[in-house]
From Swiss-Prot:
Parts forming coiled coils: 23-57
Keyword Coiled coil found: yes
GO aspect biological process, one term: intracellular protein transport
Family membership noted in the UniProt record: Belongs to the syntaxin family.
Gene3D superfamilies, per the entry: 1.20.58.70
Annotated compartments: Cell membrane; Prospore membrane
Domain of life: Eukaryota
Primary location: membrane
One Pfam family matching this protein: Syntaxin
Membrane-crossing residue ranges in chain numbering: 260-280
UniProt protein name: Syntaxin-like protein psy1
Residues in the signal sequence: none
Keywords, sorted A to Z: Cell membrane, Coiled coil, Membrane, Transmembrane, Transmembrane helix
Length: 284
């Protein structure tokens, strides 16, 4: 996980050793714990923001929220890439006990990560509803005659709060109404930020759920390559076996020829001896 930012999606990776694998699992667990801590702080800051009435304090709380949300997004991306990498590696390995252990451990951290995404998603949805309630109350203070359509415009349109605010500021409403209106604008920004986070979390959860299907083409290629390698190795072994047999046969033939030559030489020597010895004896 400490190298998670170096992972490239869809690129084959050499499987880690068992020691490296468990080290990676520990890194992922640490990152998930950090995400849990961040989400706890985000929840606390949401509650604090709802209770604040001072503009400066609200702005400071918003900055903290944005910081923790950004850091959590970064950690989630790293964890997603790390789990994706481990799943890809697991699919390249033979079906033995070590591979079963890897798959079990990978699935465990993946489940924990997805549970954490669900938890964060629920928190954001809960506080989005509370921000809307707070915004509605402030709108009612700012403009008691505001309709449901006015409220929906202020909530849903990107610049709805600002448009509503400008219309009211041109009126003769009291200072209390104008103060409430400033909070409406701030809550509108909070709601939009939460909506973006909710959309990102929902997409992340979906990506994690469909990760295996996305990897299938890559895995098929890995398996095909592995089969081709084994086939080529098998063919190479067969060729080598034939070459060895041919070499052995050639050596055997050479020894046979050598033996025949030796026998022929011996016969020739014997014949010569049988002829020459009597002749030499008669001369004497």
């Amino acid at each position: 996980m400490n190298k998670a930012n170096d992972y490239t999606l869809g690129v084959e990776m050499i499987p880690l050793s068992m020691g490296e694998f468990f080290e990676e699992i520990d890194h992922i667990r640490d990152a998930i714990r950090q995400i849990e801590d961040n989400v706890g702080r985000i929840e606390m800051l949401h509650q604090q923001s709802l209770q604040e009435i001072d503009e400066a304090n609200i702005a400071a709380t918003t900055r903290h929220l944005e910081g923790y949300t950004s850091d959590t997004r970064r950690l989630q991306t790293s964890v997603q890439l790390a789990i994706r990498s481990l799943e890809s590696q697991n699919m390249q390995l033979p079906p033995d006990n070590d591979t079963a252990t890897r798959k079990t451990q990978t699935e465990a951290v993946k489940k924990k990560f997805m549970d954490q995404i669900r938890h964060f998603l629920q928190i954001e949805k809960t506080y989005r509803a509370q921000y809307e309630q707070r915004m509605r109350r402030q709108l009612e203070i700012a403009n008691p005659r505001a309709t449901e359509d006015d409220f929906q415009t202020a909530i849903n349109e990107e610049n709805g709060g600002q448009v509503f605010a400008q219309a009211l500021l041109r009126s003769n409403r009291s200072g209390e109404a104008r103060t409430a209106l400033r909070e409406v604008q701030e809550r509108h920004a909070d709601i939009k930020r939460i909506e973006r986070t909710i959309a990102e979390l929902a997409q992340l959860f979906q990506d994690m759920a469909t990760m295996v299907q996305e990897q299938e083409p890559m895995v098929d290629k890995i398996v095909t390559d592995a089969v081709n390698v084994r086939t080529n190795m098998g063919e190479g072994t067969q060729h080598m076996d034939r070459a060895i047999k041919s070499a052995r046969a050639a050596r055997k033939k050479k020894w046979i020829c050598f033996g025949i030559c030796v026998v022929i030489i011996c016969v020739i020597v014997a014949v010569l001896c049988g002829v020459l010895i009597p002749v030499l004896g008669n001369r004497h």
